[in-house]
Amino acid sequence: MTSCGCLVLEKVEDHGGEAAGRGRGRLAQGGGGGGGGCGSCAGEWRSRSETMFPIYVMGSSRASSAAAARGIVDAAGDPIWEAVKSEAKSEAEKEPILSSFLYASVLSHDCLERALSFVLANRLEDPTLLATQLIDIFNDVMMNNKDIRRSIRLDAQAFKDRDPACAQYSWALLYLKGYHSVQSYRIAHVLWNQGRKVLALALQSRISEVFAVDIHPAARIGEGILLDHGTGLVIGETAIVGNWVSLMQGVTLGGTGKENGDRHPKIGQGALLGAGATILGNINVGEGAMIAAGSLVLKDVPPHSMAVGNPAKVVGYKDKEDPSLTMKHDARRDYFEHVAVSFSDDKANGSVVK
């Protein structure tokens, strides 16, 4: 407790007199009854919190991390990271019981990359692959790859813009396993391309176990990706997913058998894949296409069209909007500019009905 009565984190001693363990501590509140502290006690709060998380917070020290991260943002700074910090401070005041979690996950870090490394490592660790080891691996990957630093921000923006359940950037970072799955894949993909395939496969296995999402580290996925709900997604080794694609739960981008080589789907920019959609084989789903929930796609889907059913058939065309951005899961006749299927005559499939 600080002299001004503000809420602080206090170290909890075990029988040996050391910190009682990862994430353990108790919240104390002084007679002033304040929320998350004040300027006069900020230093004390930080000092006590750092004592409480001697190894758990940061991994190895990398002094250049913030400077490296700032290399991809313009003179205006890093607005997403600034928003995440502001949101975390506000939430710590509203929910004091989460103060230690928010400090360790966000407020103790100097850039979004470090915060993300911390969050992912503490979700993916196991008894033989420790969080501190993973933090160093993840930091090293992200700090040395401009593409991944750009992608983690564009993905966060995609979650904030397209998922009505994600009201804040910090919610994607801290709580949404769809976001965690995509960023973990991005790290595994970099490791795979560096020739560290065994480590990449170990991460893939752990990601699948923890998040129920199985993305092969060799798959190629663009930026601005929304993986909504983050459960039951499968993306095969030779699959390609373009920029700005939205994928709902239960989507499969799979092969058709035991053949080797290029055997998985290619998804165009701005496509929307509905819940439970299954797309099999080396086929193309065009830019701005929409695959309805529960559909089985075995043939190419034209750009800006909607495919529905099992097996899927093209039912219409919409030229002006990317469904991944509007998130309109809509098969009504009046939604389409052109109708490709007469709903009483499936023989018209694939051609515009005048």
Swiss-Prot record:
Disulfide bonds listed in the record: none
Key words of the record: Acyltransferase, Amino-acid biosynthesis, Transferase
Entry-linked SMART domains: SATase_N (SM00971)
PROSITE patterns: HEXAPEP_TRANSFERASES
Pathway assigned to this chain's UniProt record: Amino-acid biosynthesis; L-cysteine biosynthesis; L-cysteine from L-serine: step 1/2
EC number: 2.3.1.30
SUPFAM superfamilies the UniProt entry points to: Trimeric LpxA-like enzymes
Transmembrane stretches, start-end: none
GO cellular component terms given for this protein: cytosol
UniProt cross-references to InterPro entries, sorted A to Z: Hexapep, Hexapep_transf_CS, LbH_SAT, Ser_AcTrfase_N, Ser_AcTrfase_N_sf, Ser_O-AcTrfase, Serine_acetyltransferase, Trimer_LpxA-like_sf
Domain of life: Eukaryota
GO molecular function: serine O-acetyltransferase activity
Reaction equation(s) it catalyzes: L-serine + acetyl-CoA = O-acetyl-L-serine + CoA
Gene Ontology process terms (BP): cysteine biosynthetic process from serine
Family to which this protein belongs: Belongs to the transferase hexapeptide repeat family.
Record note on quaternary structure: Homomultimer.
PANTHER family reported for this sequence: SERINE ACETYLTRANSFERASE
Protein name (database record): Probable serine acetyltransferase 2
Organism the protein comes from: Oryza sativa subsp. japonica (Rice)
Lineage: Eukaryota, Viridiplantae, Streptophyta, Embryophyta, Tracheophyta
